[in-house]
A protein has these predicted regions:
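Ser/Thr-rich, Pro/Gly/Ala-heavy low-complexity intrinsically disordered linkers and tails
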Residues: 11-82, 120
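N-terminal non-cleavable signal-anchor helices
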Residues: 1-5, 32, 52, 133
Length: 358
């Protein structure tokens, strides 16, 4: 099934015009298993097992014979971790810099296949999906940008929209993207803050919250990530209910996706502090999260993005500081995000398999 899911991801990446399933939890079409009992699954991420040197009934007969002669059964050690069991919190941190609109569309093209590839691996795919503010501002500009969720005949600066404090708080749930090339409306979310399995069409809803537009303030992706998982915005440890109340669950795997075409030189603190913030949000468990970063590659050789720039890309430093395998980084200048997210599916599944819920 895992291989089928990845093939579906690749197929959609190559054929963006193919419509994706829009029902929550829908996965790729199942393919019947071969009838032969001697076949084996060669996928490195398979959760199945194959008994070598005989059939299943032979193995049971052998075990029964050993039991009859007093031979103790083999000790396979303690059971493995339970894994995340499909319970995943997805945090999307998407820059709204002037040049980011095309890259947001690339994400929207691949998201259904990424979602379905993961959904097809679990009997119960229980997700929270949240996009967050990266600049702490709300900029509508012309009222003509205003969509169905607000009154285009209203007056600036809100064009008649009803706003709250969370709409202009960095790291807070983005439910009303505003400005040029954005959704420019209040997104229709079942719980008002992030996508859950109660949302009938997660793909349409994701398109709304992820189309954050371009031309806002200075994007601060790392600051937004740190704020998003802070006790203040989550409303934990003595804080009143926050903008991101209920998003981060103690027993769910956290998957953070950062997409920006800059180095994020403006966010506060060293990259080490960003790692500590994620780990603290998961109660000190450094194995409870996976980070996916798509950023400029001008700091590498070879590179796809413009001229070489030797300045330190702190987002690359951030990924390199994460525990082995917990960070994945790709180039924002790739024409197709499909291969990156295909690798991301494998990384998330590996992290999920090893996860021990708290």
């Amino acid at each position: 099934v895992r291989r089928i899911a990845l093939l579906a991801l690749t197929a959609l990446a190559c054929n963006p015009d193919v419509p994706a399933e829009s029902t929550f939890g829908a996965g790729p079409t199942a393919v019947p298993e071969p009838a032969s009992s001697s076949s084996s699954n060669s996928s490195s991420g398979s959760t199945g097992s194959t008994i070598s040197g005989g059939s299943t009934s032979d193995a049971w007969s052998s075990s029964a014979s050993e039991a009859g002669t007093g031979t103790p059964p083999p000790d396979f050690g303690p059971p493995g971790p339970a894994g995340c069991l499909g319970k995943i919190d997805f945090l999307f941190v998407i820059s709204n810099a002037n040049t980011m609109a095309p890259h947001q569309q690339q994400l929207l093209t691949i998201f259904p296949a990424f979602y379905n590839a993961l959904a097809g691996e679990f009997a119960d795919f229980d997700v929270h999906i949240m996009s967050v503010e990266t600049d702490g501002g709300w900029f509508m500009g012309e009222c003509s940008f205003c969509g169905d969720g607000c009154n285009p005949n209203g007056t600036l600066p809100t064009c008649g929209a009803v706003l709250d404090e969370c709409d202009s708080t960095i790291g807070a749930r983005a439910t009303f993207p505003a400005g040029k090339e954005s959704s420019a409306r209040r997104c229709d979310l079942a719980n008002g803050r992030y996508i859950t399995r109660e949302d009938a069409d997660p793909f349409a809803t994701f398109e709304c919250i992820a189309t954050v537009g371009s031309g806002g303030g200075i994007p601060l992706p790392a600051d937004a990530m740190v704020a998003a998982v802070s006790d203040k915005l989550l409303g934990k440890n003595g804080y009143p209910p926050g903008c991101n109340q209920g998003f981060l669950r103690d027993d769910a795997l956290l998957v953070v996706t950062i997409i920006t075409d800059g180095y994020d030189s403006e966010s506060s603190g060293p990259a080490e502090a960003w790692v500590k913030a994620l780990t603290a949000a998961k109660h000190g468990d450094g194995s409870a999260y996976q980070v996916l970063v798509i950023t400029s590659d001008r700091d590498t050789v070879p590179h796809l993005c413009g001229d070489y720039s030797p300045a330190v890309n702190r987002l690359r430093t951030f990924v390199e500081l994460l525990p082995d395998g917990h960070g994945l980084i790709g180039s924002i200048c790739e024409n197709d995000f499909g291969p990156f997210f295909e690798t991301a599916v494998e990384a998330v599944l590996e992290r999920c398999d090893a996860y021990v819920p708290q």
